[in-house]
Amino acid sequence: MSVMFDPQAAIYPFPPKPTPLSDDEKQFYREKIKRLLKERNAVMVAHYYTDPEIQQLAEETGGCISDSLEMARFGAKHAASTLLVAGVRFMGETAKILSPEKTILMPTLAAECSLDLGCPIDEFSAFCDAHPDRTVVVYANTSAAVKARADWVVTSSIAVELIEHLDSLGEKIIWAPDRHLGNYVQKQTGADVLCWQGACIVHDEFKTQALTRLKKIYPDAALLVHPESPQSIVEMADAVGSTSQLIKAAKTLPHRQLIVATDRGIFYKMQQAVPEKELLEAPTAGEGATCRSCAHCPWMAMNGLKAIAEGLEQGGAAHEIQVDAALREGALLPLNRMLDFAATLRA
């Protein structure tokens, strides 16, 4: 598998950590959010990687906790006229693409994603233009502009199946933006894959030697790994999969202890699924390095109770997602291709 570009040369500045709230303040904002959701005919959709108190609030108010695509699909089917998206900006864009008639609000539009930041549209479009014989497949963790440049959008849950399908048709692939997921898919399928060189700042930090030491401490533990992790981590795994697939694996594996190599935000729903099991964080520090993300996306952490309340109350340019109509049409085509393909897998 060839490599052409290394956006990892860029260091993305992290946002400041949110100011902690007192218990009284948390209760105040929880009640305010519940009231505002009713007043605005809104529903809250939260990603697995948001903080536990945010996921809990989404549950309590009849919302959704899931991966980015299922968040958008839930919102599209829901009767609410407004969606409050607790996640990062590309998730709000995806929701707007699938529900253009709805108001899409976010706690902050400054919640970025290193995969999105690492795949700027101008550079990526030039990369695609240099390889016109290849089918362009992009991960859901990309901007609306990058999606519109692609032939297919894909989630980690069906990435292997889609690339197998395209390979069976004799197609050569451009994969973007996550190099680790692209490498995993290529090894699983044997397809001709040309990879963009982005990475998730959370999964890229997992350390092999530190994980080996942890496995010695917990020799009977199973290792669950998201395929955005480095190859050396994936090769150690007992189960590899998307967020929803890892939760399913936690339920089906017989092990009583689980080491989890993905954002620790997933622990909220995973522990609900397996309350009898012990969940352990895979190490992101060690081997001469300290952690930057420390197994939690700093932009996901921006989705606090106060910010959610402000997003619902204020709306406007600081909180509302807008997607240009022409760009939306361009991004909707590869998204719909993926949805149709996923439907054939479920049939």
Curated annotation (Swiss-Prot):
GO terms for molecular function: 4 iron, 4 sulfur cluster binding; metal ion binding; quinolinate synthetase A activity. It comes from the Bacteria. This is Quinolinate synthase. It is found in: Cytoplasm. Its cofactor is [4Fe-4S] cluster. Catalyzes the condensation of iminoaspartate with dihydroxyacetone phosphate to form quinolinate. Binds 1 [4Fe-4S] cluster per subunit. Belongs to the quinolinate synthase family. Type 1 subfamily. GO terms for biological process: 'de novo' NAD biosynthetic process from L-aspartate. Pathway: Cofactor biosynthesis; NAD(+) biosynthesis; quinolinate from iminoaspartate: step 1/1. Its EC number is 2.5.1.72.
